Swiss-Prot record:
The EC number(s) this enzyme carries: 6.1.1.5
Xref: InterPro entries: aa-tRNA-synth_I_CS, aa-tRNA-synth_Ia, Anticodon_Ile_ABEc, Ile-tRNA-ligase, Ile-tRNA-ligase_type2, M/V/L/I-tRNA-synth_anticd-bd, Rossmann-like_a/b/a_fold, tRNAsynth_Ia_anticodon-bd
Family the entry assigns: Belongs to the class-I aminoacyl-tRNA synthetase family. IleS type 2 subfamily.
Protein name: Isoleucine--tRNA ligase
GO MF term list: aminoacyl-tRNA deacylase activity; ATP binding; isoleucine-tRNA ligase activity; tRNA binding; zinc ion binding
Cofactor(s) required for function per UniProt: Zn(2+)
Superkingdom per UniProt: Bacteria
KW Phosphoprotein (keyword) present: no
Motif ('HIGH' region): 61-71
Native organism: Corynebacterium jeikeium (strain K411)
Binding site for ATP: 665
Length: 1092
């Protein structure tokens, strides 16, 4: 038996298990206690004082709810990058912040207080409500701190900021005033997404946030608008005169929002589209009462007649066609009489006249307008215009001089302007409106559709679009500059977001509605005169300016204190009017976007620092923030400073439950975070999340098995290597890279490559690749280096100090390289090895301090790949590893580079002979086979071209295995690689080496005997352990075997004796002895000499 007695005792230099459990969760708890007591985090920042700073923005969460997996994922990234940059010598402040204002805070407070609507807030009182909000938003700060701390995330809570802090709010005031002075803020009346449930408009980007669009069933109707005449001076006068068939015709228009029809004031057609006047056949089928439509003439886009074939009937007759431009100015009968007085007055020239030149009116409502946005993609090509409820409608009607009417109040209910529906929520009124329109014979079609519809991102109620007065940032004025800065100065991961998800959003950016009709938020710092006779508006950007004009500072910048600041209007000579603050507060996204400068109370403090440390070096959040925080920061930084807010951004994907769906507490489709921490530890969770595709923009399914992979891939290999060193080291090893042993040289050179790879990856914030580098190295360390070096370690550090020094050097360096990725596991190992204060106070290793040997690394990696491929063949043929085989043929393009390693290969895969050849083609190869069924839908007719190219050999396969045939790159699943070899069942591909191995599996009695003996050695070693022998105890061995195996046993008795430390071996036949060795063998073991 070659293994010696473990010496041990040299390690750990510091025992972070405190003599207790060495399970990872228990060790992590000890690390966290140590860091808190030691002040390690503060020291890591203070020790870099005066060095170059690395600026990182930590997006502020709300503390009125508990953290979830999304926060966990982002938090790990926010910890890894600063840890790495700190170890690279930079000072990295990690200030934690809290979002406090806005709808999320108000709605949670309402929920806690049992308030159901705005009236409840008014009854409670604005001051009391806001005071409650101020407390509520920090309700879960302790839980957040515990959560963040448990995940080993280092942040500065003590010096953190809150968006409700006076300093932060004053900086926000400054931003508003600065934008206003630049002409980039204005008050306008626009159609906006409006939440009737929350009584406030929202911004366009808020309607693009997660969960904002939901599937919803709504009624759709196609209604008639009977033509009544023409508007004087328009093309329709001539059209009506030349086409008498239009005299009794009606336009038909389609809408998915029947509740908007009481506010209809116009119709829109496309001037370039051809429209048809169609007489409905008597075989038509339509909505209830549609039989009353038989023989009537309707006007719709000619291309859409087929979409209404059922309602028009097979006997329908086209009476004439016209362009939209020829229809412009035609007047029609309103659907409802609510605003009938808005129709144009009859023109004097048309009074009493006949035909097309009669029935003329002056321009007014209820006429046809031309608009380029009208299409024939759906509907009828005639669009009903309700300018109070549609942005395009509003612009079109404004241009035509048609003022809007708003028959809906701030509760989303009809007002007295639509008396039949007064008090009804607009969505609830749909049913009654459709019923009334049917009774009037105006409905041609009535259906129900399921469509994606915007909902409030907080309350979940469906939004309406409604014309409202609001304050806007004029984003369209500097949109091109935003696009330019994004393209030229921001690095995205994944890179496609720059010109894709984010870039396209910027290109279509609209003016940003920043006012909210709410209570708890930063005030819009605008005061206006309450007199229309003496108008005046003042905008303020600081507390000092407020004190200058109002003679005092407000008790706080929140409502109602800020609202109480009033003063006489300086422009009113009568002294009767007063300057009062406008009631709105700012969109909380405006505050989040102000975070880079507002957290520093810029420009009132830290001006020089911010001016020289902006943009930030790095930020991270999930990809949906391209519509949220990423966007608002970019808007404000571009407008205020003409520079981006950040240089580099990671936009990660979404964490999904184990069923591939959104995480849900009710479904229980994800493992409890605290249970994972208790069972596997935070480092395991960190590794699972950080090594996944989610950081490259993909989504990730969280499973318990996946999390445990983190333990298997990196934590256990590192720990096992450290434990191996602890077990056998009798004295502390040294940092030494001078060993000439080939395995030592390999692992040190491999470590050099790994350190460089991790550094390159983390420099690029490519954390998943950094994890790959560590994982690959851990495999080489434990599954190759330590295993192949066991004999040297068993011999002890007095005999092979170079092995112990090398392993110490590797572990010490690996701990520093992996510290940002596995902060607690590496802390335990590193302190155990070195006895020093913390691995996180050390410098990141430099690859140039390790020996380079590219040829050796390449050759040994090939040896490992050959061994792995051979092992897979053994498994396929169910040939146990201890059974020697006659021959292995290794066919590689650079096989000659392995000549010095054939003994290692032979020993590793247990073959008697290793033959090398560089003629791979003679052994076999791979054919590419195109999967036409999969590739066909994507490639279309090109699939045949690809198949032909592959069959003729006109294709390439790159290092990543990507196949390109005749210039067309094939995707995963569109092809397979088929092994073609003389002995395919004995041949395997050598991964990553463009080669093959061929294993001769023919055995001989001699080989069988040798394998049989090796199996018995294994059984005897287990028997020694069962007998509680020391590793170095020598024994007298009696081995009982079947008669047919007696010759094998006697032939290999000496080799068996050597392996199990037997001074002598007695072979007997057919006896049952005290220790079972195998199915057919037993043994008696008597100690010959006891180890001292």
């Amino acid at each position: 038996m070659s293994e010696a007695t473990p010496a041990g005792g040299a390690y750990p230099r510091v025992d972070m298990s405190n003599g207790g459990s060495t399970a990872f969760p228990a060790l992590e708890e000890n690390v966290l206690k140590y860091w808190e007591k030691d002040g390690t985090f503060n020291e890591s920042v203070a020790s870099r004082e005066g060095n170059e700073e690395y600026v990182f923005y930590d997006g502020p969460p709300f503390a009125n709810g508990l953290p979830h997996y999304g926060h966990l994922l982002t938090g790990y990234v926010k910890d890894i990058v600063p840890r790495y940059q700190t170890m690279q010598g930079k000072k990295v402040a990690r200030v934690f912040g809290w979002d406090c204002h806005g709808l999320p805070a108000e709605l949670e407070a309402e929920k806690q207080l049992g308030i159901k609507d705005r009236a409840g807030i008014e009854e409670m009182g604005m001051r009391s409500f806001n005071e409650y909000c101020a407390t509520s938003v920090l309700r879960y700060t302790d839980e957040w701190k515990e959560y963040v701390t448990r995940q080993a995330r280092w942040v500065d809570f003590d010096n953190g900021y809150k968006t409700m802090d006076p300093g932060f709010m004053e900086s926000v005031m400054w931003a508003f005033k600065t934008l206003y002075d630049k002409g980039l803020i204005y008050q306008g009346f626009r159609v906006l997404p409006y939440s009737w449930a929350e009584h406030t408009p929202l911004s366009n980007q808020e309607t693009r946030l997660d969960d904002s669009y939901k599937m919803r069933q709504d009624p759709t109707i196609t209604v008639t608008f009977p033509i009544t005449g023409a508007t004087e001076g328009t093309a329709s006068v001539k059209t009506l005169a030349e086409h008498p068939e239009l005299a009794d015709a009606a336009f038909i228009g389609w809408t998915t929002t029947p509740w908007t029809t009481p506010a209809n004031l116009a119709l829109a057609v496309n001037p370039e589209v051809t429209y048809a006047a169609v007489r409905i056949g008597d075989d038509a089928a339509g909505a209830d009462g549609a039989e009353g439509m038989y023989g009537k003439t309707v006007v719709l886009a000619d291309d859409l007649r087929g979409a209404y074939a059922k309602e028009l009937g097979e006997k329908a007759e086209v009476l004439g066609t016209f362009t939209g431009a020829e229809l412009e100015g035609m007047t029609y009968e309103p659907l409802f009489g609510y605003f009938a007085e808005r129709a144009g007055e009859k023109a004097s020239a048309g009074e009493g006249s006949e035909g097309g030149e009669g029935n003329q009116r002056k321009p007014g409502a209820f006429r046809v307008l031309c608009a380029d946005y009208v299409t024939t993609a759906d509907g009828t090509g005639v669009v009903h215009q309700a300018p109070a409820f549609g942005e395009d409608d509003m612009f079109t009607c404004e241009a035509a001089g048609i003022d809007l009417e708003i028959p809906v109040d701030m509760d989303g209910k009809f007002t007295s302007l639509a008396p039949e529906y007064q008090g009804q929520l607009v969505f609830d009124a749909n049913k009654a409106i459709i019923k009334d329109l049917k009774a009037a014979g105006r409905v041609l079609r009535h259906q129900t559709i399921e469509h994606s519809y915007p909902h409030s991102w907080r309350s979940g109620e469906p939004l309406i679009y409604m014309a409202l007065p609001s304050w806007f940032v004029a984003v369209t004025k500097f949109r091109d500059r935003m696009v330019e800065l994004n393209h030229e100065q921001i690095e995205w991961m994944p890179s496609h977001i720059r010109d894709g998800q984010f870039g396209k959003w910027l290109e279509g950016a609209r003016d940003w509605n920043i006012s909210r009709n709410r209570y708890w938020g930063a005030p819009i710092p605008v005061w206006v005169s309450d007199s229309e006779e003496y108008p005046r508006m003042d905008v303020y950007g600081s507390l000092e300016e407020l004190e200058r004009d109002f003679g005092r500072k407000p008790a706080s910048l929140h409502r109602p204190d800020i609202d109480e600041l009033t003063r006489p209007n300086p422009d009113d000579p009568t002294g009767k009017s007063t300057m009062r603050r406008v009631p709105e507060v700012l969109d909380c996204w405006f505050e989040s976007g102000s975070m880079p400068f507002a957290q520093k109370h810029y420009p009132f403090e830290n001006k020089e620092w911010f001016d020289t440390h902006s943009p930030a070096d790095f930020i991270v959040e999930y990809s949906g923030q391209t519509r949220g925080w990423f966007y608002t920061m970019h808007v404000l930084s571009t407008a205020l400073f003409d520079r981006p807010a950040f240089k580099k951004v990671v936009a990660h994907g979404i964490v999904l439950g184990d069923d591939g769906l959104k995480m849900s507490k009710s479904k229980g489709n994800y493992p409890n975070v605290n249970e994972v921490f208790d069972r596997d530890g935070s480092d395991a969770m960190r590794w699972f999340l950080m090594s996944s595709p989610i950081l490259r923009g993909g989504n990730l399914i969280v499973t318990e098995q996946g999390i445990r992979e983190g333990v298997r891939q990196a934590m256990l290999p590192m720990w096992n290597a450290y434990s191996f060193l602890r077990l056998y080291a009798s004295q502390p090893a040294q940092y030494d890279t001078s060993s000439t042993n080939v395995l030592d040289r390999y692992i040190l050179a491999k470590l050099r490559d790994t350190v460089q790879g991790v550094s390159d990856a983390l420099d690029n914030t490519d954390i998943a690749t950094a994890c790959d580098e560590i994982r690959w190295f851990c495999d080489a360390l434990t599954n190759w280096y330590v295993r192949r070096s066991r004999d040297r370690f068993w011999a002890g550090d007095a005999v092979h100090p170079e092995a112990f020094n090398t392993l110490y050097t590797v572990l010490e360096t690996l701990c520093r390289a992996a510290a940002p990725l596995l902060p607690m596991t590496t802390e335990v190992i590193w302190r155990g090895l070195t006895g020093e204060r913390s691995v996180h106070l050390a410098d990141f290793p430099k690859s140039e301090n390790l020996p380079a040997d590219a040829e050796l690394v390449t050759a040994m990696d090939a040896v490992r790949a050959v061994s792995s491929a051979t092992s897979s063949l053994r498994k396929a043929h169910k040939l146990r590893n201890r059974l020697p085989l006659p021959k292995l043929t290794v066919a590689l393009p650079n096989a000659s580079a392995l000549e010095d390693f054939t003994k290692i290969i032979a020993d590793e895969v247990n073959v008697k002979q290793v033959e090398l050849t560089e003629d791979v083609a003679q052994v076999g190869g791979f054919e590419v086979v195109v999967n036409a069924r999969v590739a066909g839908p994507r490639l279309g007719k090109d699939v045949q071209r690809v198949i032909k190219a592959v069959k003729s050999g006109n294709y390439t396969v790159d290092d990543a295995g990507v196949v390109t045939a005749d210039g067309i790159e094939l995707q995963d699943g569109e092809f397979t690689r088929k092994l073609v070899a003389a002995e395919p069942e004995h041949t395997a591909e050598v991964s990553g080496q463009d080669g093959l191995v061929v294993l001769d599996t023919q055995t001989t009695p001699e080989l069988e005997a040798e394998g049989w003996a090796a199996d018995r050695v294994r059984g005897l070693q287990e028997a020694r352990k069962a007998a509680d022998l020391q590793i170095s105890d020598r024994i007298h061995l009696t081995l009982s075997v079947p008669a047919e195996k007696e010759e094998w046993a006697r032939t290999h008795a000496d080799s068996i004796a050597k392996e199990v430390l037997a001074t002598d071996v007695k072979v007997v036949v057919g006896e049952q002895l005290s220790h079972d060795v195998a199915d057919d063998c037993s043994a008696d073991i008597v100690v010959a000499s006891v180890a001292s």
